[in-house]
Amino acid sequence: GLSSAWRLAEVLTEAGEQVEGRIVVLDKAGIASGASGIACGVVRNNYFQPAMRNLMAHSIKVWESDPKGLSYHPVGYMQVSCEAMHEDVAQIYSEQKSIQYESVFIEGAAASSKYMKVLFDDWQAQGITSVLHEKLGGYANNTTSMYGLAKKAEELGVRIITGVEVKGFTFESSSKAIRTVETDNGSISCKHVIIGAGPWVRNFWDMLALPKKIDVKDLDHNLHKDVDMWRFWQLEEGLLQVDPEILKTNDGKVPPVIHVDTDAPLYSDVDGSLITEEMWGI
């Protein structure tokens, strides 16, 4: 939502048009109070869908346009994987090359270990047979970057109203065009509406009386009827509190963001007991 407002304001400004009073952002609570403020903050291009990869290549250019203002750290990203993921990661690398996205792909257990030990001489992960090292990307400090986005939008004349909850929409008669946005603080007339609600998009889908069930055609062209439009999976994430200094590279620098997936057995460093023999990641 904030990035859309920022870009729309840029378009109007470049065209010599007034922004104030024309772009309004409504936020139910406050800036960064939702998923954007608590998600992992990783900026990467490690996606299987080509469309997503092109989108992220574009987005990283935006991050790079103002690292300080957006609290962005361009340290790069690494996908360190076991053999079960080798083919898929190789395809991602191939498609990254096709859009001139800078990355390095290391294959083979010995070559992967050698590559990682250039960064960390005490590297000891087991079962690794490939490393995809994206030279672009890195991470951003979530809340700070969201406030940076808000600042960019407001400086161009965008009005951000917090503490306002959208309750529904009023449509033009005999039309699907939205005439007003109904909030718990009154109605706002508008010409266009952008819904940037993240995981809460289902609520707005229902407000717009859009279908709860859809038909989906799979890759083999089989049609699956009456599939739920929205399905939510519960994801549990954990944070490990460690001294940042112990994760520096051999030359004392901040390392890339590193994601390791392996099927090597995971043992407790407390009592040596087996935690899992299934694939796990960190």
Language-model segments: which ranges?
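Flavin (FAD/FMN) cofactor-binding and adjacent substrate-gating region
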Residues: 65, 84-162, 167-177, 182
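Beta1/beta-strand and adjacent pyrophosphate-binding region of the FAD-binding site
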Residues: 1, 24
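Conserved FAD-binding subdomain of flavin-dependent enzymes
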Residues: 7-17, 22, 28-103
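Alpha-helical packing segments of well-folded alpha/beta enzyme cores
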Residues: 55, 59-63, 145, 149, ...
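Fold-independent oxyanion-binding glycine-rich loops
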Residues: 28-29, 135-136, 163-164, 184, ...
